[in-house]
Swiss-Prot record:
Superkingdom of the source species: Eukaryota
GO CC annotation terms, alphabetical: dynein axonemal particle; nuclear pre-replicative complex; nucleolus; nucleoplasm; rixosome complex
GO BP terms in the entry: DNA-templated DNA replication; rRNA processing
Database matches in PANTHER family: WD REPEAT-CONTAINING PROTEIN 18, WD-REPEAT PROTEIN 18
The UniProt record lists the keyword Repeat: yes
Keywords carried by this UniProt record: Cytoplasm, Developmental protein, Nucleus, Repeat, WD repeat
WD repeats: 36-75, 78-116, 119-158, 170-211, 213-257, 267-306
Protein name (record): WD repeat-containing protein 18
Length: 432
C-alpha cells in the first residue's frame, strides 16, 4: 500500500486567476487550483476532508469548494463583518470564524449558528481546535489567548456569556499566531506575539511551560508532530528553530542568533507569515511577504525549493491529501448546508428549523427536579440527622431506617454511575 501523499496548500493576497493552489510536496507538481478571490491570513480550513473553506481577505464571507469541483464555488457563507481567521474541527462537525472581536461557531450538519462568543476586546487574529475537537484556542490583538471547552460552550445557559477555561495574559503585544500540538485536552499550545516572545502552554492545567525571547517580533509559530522542535518565523525573514528536548528546566530563556547560528533558516527577504512541518518532521514549509513559499530541509537548514506567487503569502500548510482531493469520482457524503448568518432561534423563536434536529444539551429545564447527586446529598443529610438523634431511643427502628437509607444511597450511586457510563459511551461513540 502506497504511503499517503503530502501536499502543500498555499494562498496569497494578489493572485488574479486563483484563490488557492495545491502542489505535491516533494516533486513540486501542481495538482489543483481553486478559483474565487483571495484568502486572508489564518483563513484557510479543510472541512472533514471533503470541502475547502477560505475566508476572503477583507470581505464578509467565507468561500467553500468541494475538493474535486475546484472551478465551481459551492457556497458563500455570509458573516456580519470581515472574517479575520477561520478553522474547522478535526471531526468535521463545527466551523469557527473570527469576526472582529467575536467568535462565531457553526454546526456543519445543519448550518446553524450556535453561539457568538465575545470575550476578546480587539480583533481575533487566530483560532485552532485541539486534535480531539474537545477544546479550541483563540488569540487576539488584545494580547489575550483564551482556551475554550467546546462542551461548556455548547451547554452554556443562553442568558449567560460562556466563560473560557483559561485566560492567558502573559503577552504584552498582539498575538500573531498559535499552534496546538496533539494530545487533546493534554496538548501543548505555542503562541507568538509582536512582543518578541513565543510561549508554550499546557491546556489541561493552563500553566506556562516555557517563554523564549527573540531579537525580533515573531509572526508565525509551529511544532513538529513529536514536539521536539518549535519553529518561529521572524518579522525580518529569518526562521528560528528551538529544540525543546535539550533545554534545561528553566521557564524563560533568550534565543541568540549568534550563539545558535545552526538553528536559523535564512532566505526570506520579508516577514514570515506561516509555517508548517511535514509528518516525519524532515521538511519545513514557510510563506512570506516576499511573495515566495519555501521548502526547507530541517536537518541542514537548506532551502530545497522556492515557489514564487503573485503577492504576499497569506496561508501555507502541509496536509495529508484526502481521498476526495485525488479521486475524480469522489463526492461528499453530505451536501454542505446553508450556513445561517443569525443565531439559532433569533429569527424563528425557539422552534427548530425545518430539515434539522435541534439538541439542547445541558440547558436548565423548566422543572426543578433535583439531580441524583442532589438526592444523594439530601439522603446523607437525613442519615446524619437521624444518627444524631439516636440517643432519644428507638434504636431498633433507627437501625432499620439507617439500613434503608444506606440501601437507597447505594441504589442512587449505582443509577448515577450507570448514567455516567451511558453518557460517556454515547459522547465518545465515533461518528458514522
Amino acid at each position: 500500500m502506497a504511503a499517503p501523499m503530502e501536499v502543500a496548500v498555499c494562498t496569497d493576497s494578489a493572485a488574479p486567476m486563483w484563490s488557492c493552489i495545491v502542489w505535491e510536496l516533494h516533486s513540486g507538481a501542481n495538482l489543483l487550483t481553486y478559483r474565487g478571490g483571495q484568502a486572508g491570513p489564518r483563513g484557510l480550513a479543510l472541512l472533514n476532508g471533503e470541502y475547502l473553506l477560505a475566508a476572503q481577505l477583507g470581505k464578509n464571507y467565507i468561500s467553500a469548494w468541494e475538493l474535486q469541483r475546484k472551478d465551481q464555488l459551492q457556497q458563500k457563507i455570509m458573516c456580519p463583518g470581515p472574517v479575520t481567521c477561520l478553522t474547522a474541527s478535526p471531526n468535521g462537525l463545527y466551523v469557527l470564524a473570527g469576526v472582529a472581536e467575536s467568535i462565531h461557531l457553526w454546526e456543519v450538519s445543519t448550518g446553524n449558528l450556535l453561539v457568538i462568543l465575545s470575550r476578546h476586546y480587539q480583533d481575533v487574529s487566530c483560532l485552532q481546535f485541539t486534535g480531539d475537537s474537545s477544546h479550541f484556542i483563540s488569540g487576539g490583538k488584545d494580547c489575550l489567548v483564551l482556551v475554550w471547552s467546546l462542551c461548556s460552550v455548547l451547554q452554556a445557559d443562553p442568558s449567560r456569556i460562556p466563560a473560557p477555561r483559561h485566560v492567558w495574559s502573559h503577552h504584552a503585544l498582539p498575538i500573531t499566531d498559535l499552534h496546538c500540538g496533539f494530545g487533546g485536552p493534554l496538548a501543548r499550545v505555542a503562541t507568538s506575539s509582536l512582543d518578541q516572545t513565543v510561549k508554550l502552554w499546557e491546556v489541561s492545567s493552563g500553566e506556562l511551560l516555557l517563554s523564549v525571547l527573540f531579537d525580533v517580533s515573531i509572526m508565525a509559530v509551529t511544532m513538529d508532530l513529536a514536539e521536539h522542535h518549535m519553529f518561529c518565523g521572524g518579522s525580518e525573514g529569518s526562521i528560528f528553530q528551538v529544540d525543546l528536548f535539550t533545554w534545561p528546566g528553566q521557564r524563560e530563556r533568550s534565543f541568540h542568533p549568534e550563539q545558535d547560528a545552526g538553528k536559523v533558516f535564512k532566505g526570506h527577504r520579508n516577514q514570515v507569515t506561516c509555517l508548517s512541518v511535514s509528518t516525519d518532521g524532515s521538511v519545513l514549509l514557510s510563506g512570506s511577504h516576499d511573495e515566495t513559499v519555501r521548502l526547507w530541509d530541517v536537518q541542514s537548514k537548506q532551502c530545497i525549493r522556492t515557489v514564487a506567487l503573485k503577492g504576499p503569502v497569506t496561508n501555507a500548510a502541509i496536509l495529508l491529501a484526502p481521498v476526495s482531493m485525488l479521486s475524480s469520482d469522489f463526492r461528499p457524503s453530505l451536501p454542505l448546508p446553508h450556513f445561517n448568518k443569525h443565531l439559532l432561534g433569533a429569527e424563528h423563536g425557539d422552534e427548530p428549523r425545518h430539515g434539522g434536529l435541534t439538541l439542547r444539551l445541558g440547558l436548565h429545564q423548566q422543572g426543578s427536579e433535583p439531580s441524583y447527586l442532589d438526592r444523594t446529598e439530601q439522603l446523607q443529610a437525613v442519615l446524619c440527622s437521624t444518627m444524631e438523634k439516636s440517643v432519644l431511643g428507638g434504636q431498633d427502628q433507627l437501625r432499620v431506617r439507617v439500613t434503608e437509607l444506606e440501601d437507597e444511597v447505594r441504589n442512587l450511586r449505582k443509577i448515577n454511575r450507570d448514567l455516567f457510563d451511558f453518557s460517556t459511551r454515547f459522547i465518545t461513540r465515533p461518528a458514522k
